[in-house]
Structure formats: structure tokens, C-alpha cells
Regions:
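Charged DNA-binding/catalytic regions of mobile-element recombinases
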Residues: 21-184
């Protein structure tokens, strides 16, 4: 499950809903679900959660982590895009977005382009982590996800952002903003 959060950059927050194509893992102890919140500008994963339940709570936890990490300063202009998954159209989720000053936006039915970045992250996660071995527990998936998110953010080179890692793309953005502020 990919959540794409952008708070300070292009002012766009995208979220992907839970569907059978989202990262879920068959572990020895049952299914495990994974949620990601991704900055759409730098493609940095800024929130994530692993859960044994597909209830809205774990999706809210991933969103809260992203909001805590990003601390959006602008009210208005930030859009949270999601598909029509039950978690994202729930009253609690929508209410939390509005409390944070984020405009909810729901994608059209069956339009894979609405969630292309989320699907890309899901595919990478499945190929690079989930399909590589059998999983015994949610805890094992959580530890592997933690390690992968750190690697993805700080070492994975992404062509759409100049063949640099997401954390470096952010650092360059802020350095450029600081240079502009000094010149002004």
C-alpha cells in the first residue's frame, strides 16, 4: 500500500488504497499489510506501517508519521490523492486530512495512472523484499521494511529525480531554496 506524501515541495499528498495489488505478505502467522506514504516531489518514503489488519488504523498511523516528519506549514494547497479504498474514504481518515489542512482527492475508478507512483513503489517493494524469501511473522516483515525504507530513501538511485536517492533530492532542493533566500 503506497501513500505518497508531499508537503513542502510540490504541495501534493498522494495516497494509494489497499487492494489485492498492494503489498500484503503471506506470513506463517497470517497476512501482513504494508502502507507507505511517499513524497511525490523527491519520491521519499516519509511514512510507513506494517500491520496484521487492513483496518483504517494502520493507514492513519502511516499518515501521522508522514505529517510528523513533514510538519506542513501551509494551510491549503496540499492535496491528498487516493483511490477509493475504504480506508481512505472513511470518516476518520477524511477528518484527519481536513484537520491537517489537506484537501482529499479521490481518483477515478480503474485508472492506474492515478496511482502510478504508488504502484511503482509497491512493485519495487515486492520485488526487492517480499518475493525474496518466505516470511514467518509480522515482526520479520516490519524489520525488513524498516531496512528497505532506509536503503530506498538514502541509497536507491531514481532516474526521474536525476539518478540520485530521494534524500539527496530533498537536500539539493533545500540547499537551492537557501541560496535563493540569500540572494533575495
Amino acid at each position: 500500500m503506497s501513500r505518497e506524501v508531499h508537503v513542502r515541495f510540490c504541495e501534493r499528498l498522494e495516497v494509494k488504497s489497499l487492494r489485492p495489488t498492494h503489498p500484503y505478505v503471506a506470513a506463517a502467522q497470517g497476512f501482513v499489510y504494508v502502507a507507505f506514504v511517499i513524497d511525490t516531489f523527491a519520491r521519499r518514503i516519509v511514512g510507513w506501517r506494517v500491520s496484521r489488519s487492513a483496518q483504517a488504523d494502520f493507514v492513519l498511523d502511516a499518515l501521522e508519521q508522514a505529517l510528523c516528519d513533514r510538519r506542513p506549514v501551509r494551510q491549503g494547497g496540499l492535496v491528498h490523492h487516493s483511490d477509493r479504498g475504504v480506508q481512505y474514504v472513511s470518516i476518520r481518515y477524511t477528518q484527519r486530512l481536513l484537520e491537517a489542512g489537506i484537501e482529499p482527492s479521490v481518483g477515478s475508478v480503474g485508472d492506474s495512472y492515478d496511482n502510478a507512483l504508488a504502484e511503482t513503489i509497491n512493485g519495487l517493494f515486492k520485488a526487492e523484499v517480499i518475493r525474496r524469501r518466505p516470511w514467518r511473522s509480522a515482526e520479520a516483515v516490519e524489520l525488513a521494511t524498516l531496512e528497505w525504507v532506509d536503503w530506498f530513501n538514502h541509497r536507491r538511485l531514481l532516474e526521474p529525480i536525476g539518478n540520485i536517492p530521494p534524500a539527496e533530492a530533498e537536500a539539493r532542493y533545500y540547499a537551492h531554496q537557501n541560496e535563493l533566500a540569500m540572494v533575495a
